From Swiss-Prot:
ATP 1 binds at residues 424-431. Residues 389-625, 1032-1270 form the ABC transporter domain. It comes from Cricetulus griseus (Chinese hamster). Residues 653-682 are annotated as: Disordered. InterPro entries: AAA+_ATPase (IPR003593), ABC1_TM_dom (IPR011527), ABC1_TM_sf (IPR036640), ABC_transporter-like_ATP-bd (IPR003439), ABC_transporter-like_CS (IPR017871), P-loop_NTPase (IPR027417), Type_1_exporter (IPR039421). This is ATP-dependent translocase ABCB1. One of its GO terms (cellular component) is apical plasma membrane. PGP isoforms differ in their drug transport capabilities: PGP1 and PGP2 can mediate MDR, while PGP3 apparently cannot. The modification Phosphoserine is found at residue 657. Its EC number is 7.6.2.2, 7.6.2.1. Residues 67-113, 206-212, 314-327, 730-753, 851, 955-970 are extracellular. Residues 671-682 have a biased composition (Basic and acidic residues). Residues 1-43, 135-183, 234-291, 350-708, 775-829, 872-931, 993-1276 are cytoplasmic.
Length: 1276
């Protein structure tokens, strides 16, 4: 008995303190929720479950003290016999003795029945206790998950600006499972422990109050010490979690931006950033281990001291004939078990306390009522919206940057059915205006009205439903094309979808895809080209049949051909709708009814194209800038001959992925989502994780062997203390079963009491050392594993990240949970195992010496208990894997919704995501309920076995004593040594769930750590030539993306660029242009053919060396959430970049002045993924970043496509400056930007179709010529 308590005695005995004080104290030490609030989501059935479970737990708890009553009476029966055989001198007494022995056996049979009866009761109530509490918890957690997700979906955009997306995902997974841990069977165990406590004390007082009071005198000391430790511990737990949360955020950001990290060789830097955050968590963890173990050691010292005192006093009472020895034992054990049970309660209290902490954050978010409530039913829903819009004196600044005023008194009127174009420089408030109209934010002052009605009085959802939005970077969800369009409006029919798709000019390309409307678009739509995504987004907006259409640079990121098609679709869509267009390319807005010029947060001029050209204001300036430099660039808009388009669509399939890939660069960051949710869960379940042995896990910790040696030694000593206790205990009782004089009794009992005290001192020392050494080793291991896993993740090649199983969400979850779970299976757990083995081992050896017959009987029983434990472990381990997998599925849905929250909101699809999330929780929920029963059955069986073994043991013991084969003293010794030992083994089985999880986690970890990618970013092999001239050659290169092996991208591409030349790649969207850049960066290797650099094959070159000479600027640059200076310095991670260099690069990229104008200059943080900057600003920072590398080869992947005229002009100048003296490969949609390239190559269907200079190609009158004329035509 005593052992099982003592391990948990760890955080010990604080119960009394906590129960009473918790409310008061916790209030000051924010933030936890009150005890009853924890159960705010319990329905009546849950309450019933909890009630019945609690009753069962209380009955179960009383069983142990009751057994002590039986035990005491039984000891008296033995003792009365024990005093006889010594007088057995003659035959007469001999006969008399056999009567007595006969009577003893009879009595023992009765006691055996009592024991069995108690056991049978326990079998039933223990099952009810565990399964009912687990059921209640499973049901509540299911509700909490849904409520929490609902609450997140219900928040307004401003809330997301200030909350970290990664953190929300962690809360959804980790914090909710913490609540789960805290409100399930642990509470049942707590009530059980409390019942044992009260039961024990009641029996103690009724059977012998004097002794009880003496034992009680020591309890407050125990309670106090424990209470203090518990407080200290919980504060460490919080700090540790915070410390890891930071590291987790770093990991999420890095994995999301993995392409950027790889291209800039930032792995080392990121590893360091991650590692520094881990260091903090490790330090706190070690402190926590020390604290926990001092408290445990102290508790043991006090416990043994109380034994010493109790036995010393108890013997005095027996000698003075006040109590019988049986009474002393009953009182002693009942009170002791009672006191210990508080120790047992403590881990449960700790779990509950952790749960309260986790619930605080979660319930807070659930209770946070947004000021713009998208679920609200209130608000006016006009029957007929004409679409007259008015912005009156609008002032606004973003909640995350209140000091920066964006709009400063904006006034604008739009008549129903008009098209208004907003033009102006990047960052002047155009997009903000559109966001205010959708009520993603409310203005700080001023009114936005529709048909004269303040939009704040209109129902939010209704308002957003009458608005269709197409933005610059459309977000598609990881499902089919049809489903994506359905996100526009829920009850839309297939006919309506087809109609919308035709209007959006997307029907033809969809019908050419192998699965047509059921084609999966991939994470963030990664399998489609930009033009295709954009058209699907338009179809999605049209299917809503909106009264108001908002086009936020809907065509800026497209190439000429796609743009022509998309623009045509938009023009069709605008008919009869009030439309607000934001465009950088002014050609797209010439035919708007009103053009409004923005400057400095207000509208400075409005009128149509002709009027504004006469006014010669901002618009005029913008137009002139565009026409001067970019003759043709406007062209992108106009239609192409039908057959060209089909052609384009065919090819765009080929490399659908390529363009995408580029986009996904930035996108993937925002959307750790899987290819297809259905697939994710299924596949994940079949995932073959090689099983792994315990030793393999320990090996991970091998470098901490000195800690282990000390720890294991202490654990062995600790284990041996238990049998030592049994010996002393049986000797004490033995003193009274022998017929000796009082003086000898007094002397013996004093000696044994002293020995108890010595045991205490030893245990204090060994517990502390054991805990400290294993705790430290465990923390070092956790840190090392997280580091190794992260390091290994960063080492993988890009195709590994393309794999739907390795989305950002899935990987960050791995990092967060796996290492912690492995720690669970090493250090402290190993200590418990060693301790228990030592305990049973010494116990068995001693028992065999003192009474082999009884030992053998007991050893027959013990395995049954052990087997039950093993079965329990097996059942749970299968469960562990399934649990994890199933929740990953719902995690993906959640991450997708949270990451793309703006899109979800503007499509008013919060409800849809909630339903999907709820759907994905069904299976884990059903399994939780199933598990409750399994857990209940195994638990009750192991518990009840103990009582049955008591019955068998003492009945057989009586038989042996009667035959004079053993003395009662030895029966006790053998019994306590073996039974306590066995309980200790039960303890090992009780940690089954953790171990099962740890094995699964460890296999994952080892799988990741040992995975060597085909393109190894860390490899030191390969050539590192001293000079690099920059001659690039592609020879018959064949390639397709690993995730879509059936779609060829490059089909025998030949290209050559001489050093210092600028090569421009043009072609329709998805023809393989970006792929060229990715192959040169060695994100992928070609399937056939070779890429040469200065005549050497790139796969012969050292990867790091190769990438160090390439500078890349892509269409949607990814910035990290740190300062501008740090973002620029990221360009060269191989050295420390000085502030001068940073500024020089910034000047070259034309962004220095802008940075200097910011309040914090170069130390301004750019926000998550650079959200605090406009596109043009981000782009220039990205260019500065590429220049800091001083690359020999510059890769520009549509670096200016997403910019407005003014930014573009500036950026283009920066790029022209940057190209000087470098080999440069440019991918451009706007042909004006590449007229002066040394070589222009037209790619179609993955092959080169034409090449030459601008003039030569125009003379050929081929594909290039027609592209140029399309663009120029648009211009005129």
């Amino acid at each position: 008995m005593e052992f099982e308590e003592d391990f948990s005695g760890r955080k010990d005995k604080n119960f009394l303190k906590m129960g009473r004080k918790s409310k008061k104290e916790k209030k000051e030490k924010k933030p936890v929720v009150s005890v009853f609030t924890m159960f705010r989501y319990a329905g009546w059935l849950d309450r019933l479950y909890m009630l019945v479970g609690t009753l069962a737990a209380i009955i179960h708890g009383v069983a142990l003290p009751l057994m002590m009553l039986v035990f005491g009476d039984m000891t008296d029966s033995f003792a009365s016999v024990g005093n006889i055989p010594t007088n057995a001198t003659n035959n007469a007494t001999q006969v008399n003795a056999s009567d007595i022995f006969g009577k003893l056996e009879e009595e023992m049979t009765t006691y055996a029945y009592y024991y069995t009866g108690i056991g049978a009761g326990v079998l039933i109530v223990a099952y009810i206790q565990v399964s009912f509490w687990c059921l209640a918890a499973g049901r509540q957690i299911h509700k909490i998950r849904q409520k929490f997700f609902h609450a997140i979906m219900n928040q307004e955009i401003g809330w997301f600006d200030v909350h970290d997306v990664g953190e929300l995902n962690t809360r959804l997974t980790d914090d909710v499972s913490k609540i789960n841990e805290g409100i399930g069977d642990k509470i049942g165990m707590f009530f059980q422990a409390m019942a044992t406590f009260f039961g024990g004390f009641i029996i103690g007082f009724t059977r012998g109050w004097k002794l009880t009071l003496v034992i009680l005198a020591i309890s407050p000391v125990l309670g106090l010490s424990a209470g203090i430790w518990a407080k200290i511990l919980s504060s460490f737990t919080d700090k540790e979690l915070q410390a890891y949360a930071k590291a987790g955020a770093v990991a999420e950001e890095v994995l999301a931006a993995i392409r950027t990290v790889i291209a800039f060789g930032g792995q080392k830097k990121e590893l360091e950033r991650y590692n520094n955050n881990l260091e903090e968590a490790k330090r706190l963890g070690i402190k926590k281990a020390i604290t926990a173990n001092i408290s445990m050691g102290a508790a043991f010292l006090l416990i043994y001291a109380s034994y010493a005192l109790a036995f010393w006093y108890g013997t005095s009472l027996v000698i003075s004939k006040e109590y019988s020895i049986g009474q002393v034992l009953t009182v002693f054990f009942a009170v002791l078990i009672g006191a210990f049970s508080i120790g047992q309660a403590s881990p449960n209290i700790e779990a509950f306390a952790n749960a309260r902490g986790a619930a605080y954050e979660i319930f807070n978010i659930i209770d946070n009522k947004p000021s713009i409530d998208s679920f609200s039913k209130n608000g006016y829903k006009p029957d007929n919206i004409k679409g007259n819009l008015e912005f009156k004196n609008i002032h606004f600044s973003y909640p995350s940057r209140k000091d920066v005023q964006i709009l400063k008194g904006l006034n604008l009127k739009v008549q129903s059915g008009q098209t208004v174009a907003l033009v102006g420089n990047s960052g002047c408030g155009k997009s903000t205006t559109v966001q205010l109209l959708q009520r993603l934010y409310d203005p700080t002052e001023g009114v936005v009205s529709i048909d004269g009605q303040d939009i704040r009085t209109i129902n939010v959802r209704y308002l957003r439903e009458i608005i269709g939005v197409v933005s610059q970077e459309p977000v598609l969800f990881a499902t089919t094309i049809a489903e994506n369009i359905r996100y526009g409006r829920e009850n839309v029919t297939m006919d309506e979808i087809e109609k919308a798709v035709k209007e959006a000019n997307a029907y033809d390309f969809i019908m050419k895809l192998p699965h047509k409307f059921d084609t999966l678009v991939g994470e963030r739509g990664a399998q489609l080209s930009g033009g295709q995504k954009q058209r699907i987004a338009i179809a999605r907006a049209l299917v809503r049949n909106p009264k108001i259409l908002l086009l936020d640079e809907a065509t800026s990121a497209l190439d000429t051909e796609s743009e022509a098609v998309v623009q045509a679709a938009l023009d069709k869509a605008r008919e009869g709708r009030t439309t607000i267009v934001i465009a950088h390319r002014l050609s797209t807005v010439r035919n708007a009814d009103i053009i409004a010029g923005f400057d400095g947060g207000v509208i400075v001029e409005q009128g149509n194209h002709e009027e504004l050209m006469r006014e010669k204001g901002i618009y005029f300036k913008l137009v002139m800038t565009q026409t001067a430099g970019n003759e043709i660039e406007l062209g992108n808009e106009v239609g192409e001959s039908k057959n060209e388009i089909d052609n384009l669509d065919m090819s765009s399939k080929d490399s659908a992925s390529s363009l995408i890939r580029r986009r996904s660069t930035r996108r993937s960051i925002r959307g750790p989502h899987d290819q297809d949710r259905k697939l994710s869960t299924k596949e994940a379940l079949d995932e073959d994780v090689p099983p792994i042995s315990f030793w393999r896990i320990l090996k991970l910790n091998s470098s901490e062997w000195p800690y282990f040696v000390v720890g294991i030694f202490c654990a062995i000593v600790n284990g041996a203390l238990q049998p030592a206790f049994s010996i002393i205990f049986s000797k004490v009782v033995g003193v009274f079963t022998r017929n000796t004089d009082d003086e000898t009794k007094r002397h013996d009992s004093n000696l044994f009491s002293l020995l108890f005290l010595i045991l205490g001192v030893i245990s204090f020392i060994t517990f502390f050392l054991q805990g400290f050494t294993f705790g430290k080793a465990g923390e070092i291991l956790t840190k090392r594993l997280r580091y190794m896993v992260f390091k290994s993740m960063l080492r993988q090649d890009v195709s590994w990240f393309d794999n739907p199983k390795n989305t950002t969400g899935a990987l960050t979850t791995r990092l967060a949970n796996d290492a912690g779970q492995v720690k669970g299976a090493t250090g402290a757990r190993l200590a418990v195992i060693t301790q228990n083995i030592a305990n049973l081992g010494t116990g068995i050896i001693i028992s065999l010496i003192y009474g082999w017959q009884l030992t053998l009987l007991l050893l027959a029983i013990v395995p049954i208990i052990a087997i039950a434990g093993v079965v329990e472990m097996k059942m749970l381990s299968g469960q562990a894997l399934k649990d994890k997998k199933e929740l990953e599925g719902s995690g993906k849905i959640a991450t997708e919704a949270i990451e793309n929250f703006r899109t979800v909101v503007s499509l008013t699809r919060e409800q849809k995501f909630e339903n999907m999330y709820a759907q994905s929780l069904q299976i884990p929920y059903r399994n939780a309920l199933k598990k409750a029963h399994v857990f209940g059955i195994t638990f009750s069986f192991t518990q009840a076995m103990m009582y049955f073994s008591y019955a068998a043991c003492f009945r057989f013991g009586a038989y042996l004593v009667a035959r004079e084969l053993m003395t009662f003293e030895n029966v006790l010794l053998v019994f306590s040594a073996i039974v306590f030992g066995a309980m200790a083994v039960g303890q090992v089985s009780s940690f089954a769930p953790d171990y099962a999880k740890a094995k699964v986690s460890a296999s994952h970890i080892i799988m990741i750590i040992e995975k060597v990618p085909s393109i190894d970013s860390y490899s030191t092999g390969g050539l590192k030539p001293n000079t690099l001239e920059g001659n690039v050659k592609f020879n018959e290169v064949v390639f397709n993306y690993p995730t879509r092996p059936d779609i060829p991208v490059l089909q025998g591409l030949n290209l050559e660029v001489k050093k210092g030349q600028t090569l421009a790649l043009v072609g329709s969207s998805g023809c393989g242009k970006s792929t060229v850049v990715q192959l040169l960066e060695r994100f992928y290797d070609p399937m056939a053919g070779t890429v040469f650099l200065d005549g050497k094959e790139v796969n012969q070159l050292n990867v790091q060396w190769l990438r160090a000479h390439l500078g890349i600027v892509s269409q949607e640059p990814i910035l990290f959430d740190c300062s501008i200076a740090e973002n620029i310095a990221y360009g060269d991670n191989s050295r420390v970049v000085s502030q001068d260099e940073i500024e020089r690069a910034a000047k070259e990229a034309n962004i220095h002045q802008f940075i200097e104008s910011l309040p914090d200059k170069y130390n301004t943080r750019v926000g998550d993924k650079g959200t605090q900057l406009s596109g043009g600003q981000k782009q220039r920072i990205a260019i500065a970043r590429a220049l800091v590398r001083q690359p020999h080869i510059l890769l520009l992947d549509e670096a200016t496509s997403a910019l407005d005229t003014e930014s573009e002009k500036v950026v283009q100048e920066a790029l022209d400056k940057a190209r000087e003296g470098r080999t440069c490969i440019v991918i451009a949609h706007r042909l004006s930007t590449i007229q002066n390239a040394d070589l222009i190559v037209v790619i179609q269907n993955g092959k080169v179709k034409e090449h030459g200079t601008h003039q030569q190609l125009l003379a050929q009158k081929g594909i290039y010529f027609s592209m140029v004329s399309v663009q120029a035509g648009a211009k005129r």
